[in-house]
Amino acid sequence: MQDIINGRCGWCGTDELYVKYHDEEWGKTVTDDKTLFEFLVLESAQAGLSWITILKKREGYRKAFCNFDATQVAQMTDEDVERLMHFDGIVKNRLKIKSTITNAKLFLAIQKEFGSFYNYTLSFFPDRNPIINHFQSLSEIPVSSPESDAMSKDMKKRGFKFFGSTICYAHLQASGFINDHLTDCICRNQKQ
């Protein structure tokens, strides 16, 4: 894989949806909990799959999971799980669907404990600031970090599913807590 394609991090290639996600969302700091919950749902769904697979089903996930409203998702029932097993807009994996409901309940508990999921996430970062890495090659970007290790360990202890350190690291990249845009990427120095 090329490090830079058309001025961008090479992982997004030339797929229009992927490029738009890279340019408009990935690595930009997210402070609102609704979007953080959306990324948590989508990143968890990605486990074992490619990100582009989930990105292409994003609107299906939005429809299936109450526009990513954690309170509504937390109230979903076994009947909802059965309904979603027949919904074409998402990956039909019973364990992942059920874990999304469980994770929503745990997400709400974290909000109550920390004031917001954003505050909870920042608690794993030195000086409570996002990390800006200075990688020049895609091969330098790690799949996890001390922050993702600690956060995923804490989340697992709380009962979260499908959110190991690698998925957690991807979540932190997506939501701008870790900026891994390559130094030569056109998005590198854009206002976050």
Predicted features by range, described:
Residues 1-192:
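HhH-family (HhH-GPD) DNA N-glycosylase catalytic core used in base-excision repair
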